[in-house]
Amino acid sequence: MKTLPLALLPLLLATAAHAAPDPYAARVAKVLKATPLIDGHNDWPEALADKVKDQRWTVPLNRLDPATFHTDIERLRAGGVGGQFWSVWVSADLPELQQVKDTLEQIDLAHSFARRYPKDFAFVNTAAELRAAHKAGRVASLLGVEGGGQIDGSLAVLRSYRQLGASYLTLTHARTIAWADSATDNPQHDGLTPFGEAVVHELNRLGMLVDLSHVSEGTMLDALRVTKAPVIFSHSSARAICNTPRNVSDTVLKQVAANGGVVMVNYAPQYVSEARRIWSAARSGEIARYNAPPFNGLYIGDPEGAKKALADWEKANPEPVVTLSQVADHIDHIAKVAGVDHVGIGSDFDGVGSLPQGLSGVQTYPALLAELMRRGWSDADVAKLAGENVLRVMAAAEKVAAGMAGEPAGTGTVAGLDGVK
């Protein structure tokens, strides 16, 4: 084998150092300069509350431990983030009045980002304000209330959240509530009750987005029937690829296209990979076998034995790897079924325990956009995915609200509308 003369080595190194930049990186940067990248769902406020407790009000947010948090200011900048819907989530297992109190604290915590770092964040309420914040070099911050239980059956509480800057309401979280069925709980209403329909109407009147992540398919279809404005799924993926009820079926995707809404793709591995979903269910079944109360668990009273048995099971049944490419598959599928005008990004960063390879934090959005470009997506279509689609939905909801401005505020109650005693 011939070797290169040593005299050529400096020239080759210099040539490599001045090689043309990655064409996809350049294209992504151009798109994100013109269009704000908007993520529909990030649980950073709740993650701060959970992991640093009372220090959440004062902990420096510029740089946080990436092993603990998916988000910080430096990584938001590196990821080219232009707009973020911060989730204000509280457990659906709490009494609803407690959920209201905790929601108010989460809202204030999200507002504190802009209060503490005004050069980095700007709190916004409209599509135009979001574009202006992006143009000024700030991350536009919006709020999403992640669960209908958080209004405690009160349209007045819903209006108060709107006055505090909430931009969407997720109709349920993990539990079915008095007026809407959840995707992950036993149905009670076959979708929305009359009060649930009144909530959708009030959301339209207020200019708040109707978020259908977490709800049952019956609730999805009822909301799509009732709403006057386009809906969002703030963090859901394609059920045809991963068959969990948290994802969106092709039937509903076609309805979303007709409605003008947008499905913002989730990164949670159990909603991305069917193999990972099945593995997770099997693992949960093993844990239940070890600990089934009161007397039937294989390792009742023997926590070390249960721990070893689970480790042995995991060794024999390794966790399936989930990747950035699989997330892109969901985006491709939704674009194919509903159209490229109806897909976005809703990562669920800081709300999940693990993430796909290649999507470890908010700095990784450009890698996902580059993957789609490799698959043949045009810059214009990537811009739609990144932010233009949800901006269109926001503007449409604002227009609907303007047309309903003469209507009185809703005053219905669960008892009055649903006949609940």
Residue map of PLM features:
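Bacterial N-terminal signal peptides
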Residues: 5-14
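Divalent metal-binding pocket/active-site signature
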Residues: 150, 163-247
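N-terminal hydrophobic targeting/anchoring segments and the immediately downstream early-domain regions
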Residues: 19-190, 243-421
